[in-house]
Amino acid sequence: MKRGEKPEGYRQMRPKTFPASNYPGSSRQMLQEIRESLRNLSKPSDASKAEHNLNKMSTEDPRQVRNPPKFGTHHKALQEIRNSLLPFANETSSSRSPSEVNPQMFQDLQAAGFDEDMVIQALQKTNNRSIEAAVEFISKMSYQDPRREQMSAAAARPINATMKPGNVQHSINRKQSWKGSKESLVPQRHGPSLGENVVYRSESPNSQADVGRPLSGSGIAAFAQAHPSNGQRVNPPPPPQVRSVTPPPPPRGQTPPPRGTTPPPPSWEPSSQTKRYSGNMEYVISRISPVPPGAWQEGYPPPPLTTSPMNPPSQAQRAISSVPVGRQPIIMQSTSKFNFTPGRPGVQNGGGQSDFIVHQNVPTGSVTRQPPPPYPLTPANGQSPSALQTGASAAPPSFANGNVPQSMMVPNRNSHNMELYNINVPGLQTAWPQSSSAPAQSSPSGGHEIPTWQPNIPVRSNSFNNPLGSRASHSANSQPSATTVTAITPAPIQQPVKSMRVLKPELQTALAPTHPSWMPQPVQTVQPTPFSEGTASSVPVIPPVAEAPSYQGPPPPYPKHLLHQNPSVPPYESVSKPCKDEQPSLPKEDDSEKSADSGDSGDKEKKQITTSPITVRKNKKDEERRESRIQSYSPQAFKFFMEQHVENVLKSHQQRLHRKKQLENEMMRVGLSQDAQDQMRKMLCQKESNYIRLKRAKMDKSMFVKIKTLGIGAFGEVCLARKVDTKALYATKTLRKKDVLLRNQVAHVKAERDILAEADNEWVVRLYYSFQDKDNLYFVMDYIPGGDMMSLLIRMGIFPENLARFYIAELTCAVESVHKMGFIHRDIKPDNILIDRDGHIKLTDFGLCTGFRWTHDSKYYQSGDHPRQDSMDFSNEWGDPSNCRCGDRLKPLERRAARQHQRCLAHSLVGTPNYIAPEVLLRTGYTQLCDWWSVGVILFEMLVGQPPFLAQTPLETQMKVINWQTSLHIPPQAKLSPEASDLIIKLCRGPEDRLGKNGADEIKAHPFFKTIDFSSDLRQQSASYIPKITHPTDTSNFDPVDPDKLWSDGSEEENISDTLNGWYKNGKHPEHAFYEFTFRRFFDDNGYPYNYPKPIEYEYIHSQGSEQQSDEDDQHTSSDGNNRDLVYV
């Protein structure tokens, strides 16, 4: 019947792997015996005998009918082989060993219409040099001669037609049986598979000759044609190579006749047992695709091409015929594995075929044989035949090695994967017949004669030749299903591997076991079917699509099968579904279910093909690529992050304890009742909980609306901004990461963030949030509307001594508060002293501040081995003016000289030499005393009107500072009081005798501050100067900003981002530079620092600030954790 057509009730079955034969001896011994017997075989074949066998097969189990390979010329040789294998056949007959089917398969091959002429012609063309040569010639002829394909297809069709829908299960490609028989028979050294022999010469022609005559290949062709998962031939592929396959179990109610009415020779039995393990697994894999019987390396008869259930007898003969070379292993049907009783032949065929498509090729007689003991599936017979059939694949551990050694399992998996993709795909089978074509041609010519049994070819070529049937059967066989009794020796397993023409089969192997495993899971209830996928495939075998297994040349091992196969191998899902369907149907062994399942599995198989292991792996690679896009960090970055993170976690804990202690102290001072105290404790706990949650909130610049720029710095700007949600006013300081990195200011920025976060006093500008984006760092701080001290100095010129005394007293308290926190400001100057609306000062710009912490060391943030100079460690040119030879460079170094000079000038931007202590400039080591030097210089400037060491260039200024003993002069015209002059002289001197060495109290005790009461809060006293502020956003106290210096938004940001990314990638700068930068203050009152937006109600600062501190602020007066993410309550 035409490809794609299926006999009514026909069910496409996937070829099943045949269990290893019962051969008692080692697989190698069996193979050697087979090899020897094949060498001594005579080529004449008894056509009549073959026909008799074929008829016998067809009568015994129409399902098992496949195009019987004709071994007309070699019939005698085949008979001799059968005789030598009778002992094994007897053993396998009990287990339904395929050896019994051998005589029948010969007859079936002849009855199937395989011409002996092809075999004869092959022998003539090859001058009877060897069986291998004849098989190769027949393979080529079968590929080239479509007529023979039609003949082989026609031979298979009658069998399909004869099959009964009820009993007929889709012929299962018995490639495995072919594999098992042949591999077990043929020594492993025959590397190439039959397909290879057909399409390619076997790897070891000698071994091929030794193997003896494989089936003329007609059997394989018949198998390929008859193998359509439907069990009926869809378009007959070019005659697939004939492979010995165990016929499917006889239809229900029928007792499967032993394969080949005569049991295979005893020699076959042992080999079949041995093969059952290795051969079954390997051959199921490699034999699933039809291979010329002669090509089967392992001596396993090539799996018969189970085109349709109608061909079971011929299939059995084929299996035998492929074996007839004298090494034809007896292949038990998968059903026999399940110990299907003859009474259950129909069930066995249905289940066995679905489970082991290859086995269906074996005559029902062989099916009736129980699988060799290694296959535990025998008990599956107890199950309903259909259950056994469909569940057989599931019941035997798919690739679980239930009965088959894992060594066999692995090779079988390899070939199984390939074959699974080939099985049930008519297109693939058609394509595969190339490798199986030689056997197919031989089959039309009655080609059991093919003298050249290419053992290597059978292994791989089977998997390739019977893409459809082979895969289906292979999947089933690859599982340790008892369905196939094909004797398989470990050697055959190795051979399939040798036969593998492509590395991809290994990938297939990986997936193939998955398919069988998955299939068995759905069908696990039914143990008889070891390969659930096989079961599914058997269901797909019903649909004509699956039933068109054309075994032309073996297509490229894996991908092509997947692409071309449609239903032969159900995809994982399809397999599982058919298994589920078949499980219910297993008891029935209903072909209708199989056909329906086969249709579904066909579609699923297409999907499965689409999702071949290769495709899956490719997808995984894509995922890996996506994962690789995630930035990976260096060990240094990890170390840096973990050190800071752990330090901050511990710090946060200490701050929580401190806040709790503050609350207790405040409640004790106020004298709250116990109930009130409990209520306050609960409130604190709630705030702590909210803080832990809220500090993880993300912040970005979109939360703030910029109102006006207040100032531009070396690498940042300060703007007045309003928070969108609370409408509160803040001063936002923005730093470009690019500039921070270029100027090596990472450590300074980290120090500034730490001091602002930890500082919780009125002398330091309060930091509310710090966060960052890819380009910038952001500090959100109190807005101080009074401007800075430098602006006031410029406007007033010289301060009255009382005003100077007031500001210096507050500055002393502010510096003391910084020192108490363990920091050194290092950059105390009028520019960094802000005046609030009440006239009191606050320190800001802690860019040069340091806490002598490892995170504040600029060298810690440098990548590479080139140490960069700390920004506060001035260059050597500062030390000695003569060292700066910027103009004395050689012309080739002029460009470098210019950069060197710029470096000198840059230091004037980082710490003006006018206010820097000499020990800092000399880098002789400095302490907190350096800040007191700056206080003396500022006092001098307030009273005199200019800095004491003013010079034309920073270099000269530095030299004056270093030589302060000679350069420091208080001009008499300034008319300073003796106390003021004395304080200046005592502050501006060497650190060893500088005032403040013993603490700030020394300075407070100086006569200059005799009118200042440091015991009371200076901030509560009225200031001598109160700035004028007309409205909340008044910025008149700040110097106007040059419009040309304003930051421009736009393309520059993109360039900055690109630059940063390039630096990080090139390792120029460490990626951990800005770790742990984000921060959120513990009590920020939802953005209202004083419960009202600033500075509208700024006059309430004191009252509300005191209220906050009395209850809550005291709890949190310590600055919120250093590294708390910015979160707003």
From Swiss-Prot:
Domain AGC-kinase C-terminal span(s) in chain numbering: 1010-1089
Molecular function per GO: ATP binding; magnesium ion binding; nuclear estrogen receptor binding; protein kinase binding; protein serine kinase activity; protein serine/threonine kinase activity
Region Interaction with YAP1, annotated ranges: 525-654
Cellular component GO terms, alphabetical: centrosome; cytoplasm; glutamatergic synapse; midbody; postsynapse; spindle pole
Keyword Kinase: yes
UniProt: ATP binding residues: L710, G711, I712, G713, A714, F715, G716, E717, V718, K733
Predominant localisation class: cytoplasm
Protein name in UniProt: Serine/threonine-protein kinase LATS1
Organism listed in the record: Mus musculus (Mouse)
